[in-house]
């Protein structure tokens, strides 16, 4: 089994592992690397099957997490965006000795809308999966557009995400389909009460995929951490609002209140 693409940079002493979302790759973090490099040693990872960690093998959430753990520092902060947030949360739940702190960005322990739980309708995710077979490229572009919908800088943010996708090899349809299945089927809510490490949860106030209404519900399920809602942001707050995002992240890492 080949190693994942893993790029380490930054002059800081704290290790920070950054995990991207569905359809993308580690290049999505490049715009905030300069703001974080002084405080952190950054580990930019292409998840299995994505970008330069190519391959057609679909992975379960546990398998994907194990692949990242195999190359991760012995102890680090883990930051995951969207699908990457599920991987980071899985690591924190089942390997807490390896995770000094958890940061999730526009992520949810359960992405699918359920009774009294806001999220993405299951039929919408099914629809994207069926579209992957018919129009691979267009389906990815549609999903990227959904991630920025509502933000003041939506058009600019969509262009930025699209450039990230095009900068590296596209994931296979099998890998993308498996990723959508993870978003549709994963439910980590029952395990959240066992988390006993610092946890910062970023949400975009205008996010249509992970609605801000989920924030107090996650707060009620977890004994630790807190939620931070960024006004004017959609599903990619680190792209649309890099300054408040990086400031809050650095304060969290320093152990200060955010």
Curated annotation (Swiss-Prot):
Substrate binds at residues 22, 82-83, 143-147, 235. Keywords: Biotin biosynthesis, Cytoplasm, Hydrolase, Serine esterase. The active site is at 82 (nucleophile), 207, 235. Residues 16-242 form the AB hydrolase-1 domain. GO terms for biological process: biotin biosynthetic process. It holds the Pfam family Abhydrolase_1. Pathway: Cofactor biosynthesis; biotin biosynthesis. It catalyses: 6-carboxyhexanoyl-[ACP] methyl ester + H2O = 6-carboxyhexanoyl-[ACP] + methanol + H(+). Its EC number is 3.1.1.85. GO terms for cellular component: cytoplasm; membrane. GO terms for molecular function: pimelyl-[acyl-carrier protein] methyl ester esterase activity. It is found in: Cytoplasm. The physiological role of BioH is to remove the methyl group introduced by BioC when the pimeloyl moiety is complete. It allows to synthesize pimeloyl-ACP via the fatty acid synthetic pathway through the hydrolysis of the ester bonds of pimeloyl-ACP esters. Belongs to the AB hydrolase superfamily. Carboxylesterase BioH family. Monomer. This is Pimeloyl-[acyl-carrier protein] methyl ester esterase. It comes from Edwardsiella ictaluri (strain 93-146). The gene is bioH.
């Amino acid at each position: 089994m080949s190693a994942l693409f893993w790029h380490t940079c930054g002059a800081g002493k704290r290790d920070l592992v950054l995990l991207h979302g569905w359809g993308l790759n580690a290049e999505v973090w490049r715009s905030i690397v300069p703001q974080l490099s002084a405080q952190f040693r950054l580990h930019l990872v292409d998840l299995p099957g994505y970008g330069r960690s190519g391959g057609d093998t679909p992975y379960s959430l546990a398998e994907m997490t194990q692949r990242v753990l195999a190359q991760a520092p012995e102890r680090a902060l883990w930051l995951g965006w969207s699908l990457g947030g599920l991987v980071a949360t899985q690591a924190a739940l089942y390997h807490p000795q390896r995770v000094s702190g958890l940061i999730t960005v526009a992520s949810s322990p359960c992405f699918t809308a359920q009774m009294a739980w806001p999220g993405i309708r299951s039929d919408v995710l099914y629809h994207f999966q069926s579209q992957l077979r018919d129009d691979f490229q267009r389906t990815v572009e549609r999903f990227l557009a959904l991630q920025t919908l509502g933000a003041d800088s939506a058009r600019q943010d969509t262009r930025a995400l699209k450039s990230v996708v095009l900068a590296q090899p596209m994931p296979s349809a099998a890998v993308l389909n498996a990723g959508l299945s993870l978003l549709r089927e994963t439910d980590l809510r029952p395990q959240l009460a066992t988390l006993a490490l610092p946890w910062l949860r970023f949400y975009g106030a205008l996010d249509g995929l992970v609605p801000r209404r989920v924030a107090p519900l996650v707060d009620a399920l977890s004994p630790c951490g807190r939620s931070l809602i960024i006004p004017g942001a959609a599903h990619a707050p680190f792209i649309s609002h890099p300054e408040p995002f990086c400031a809050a992240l650095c304060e969290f890492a320093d152990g200060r209140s955010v």
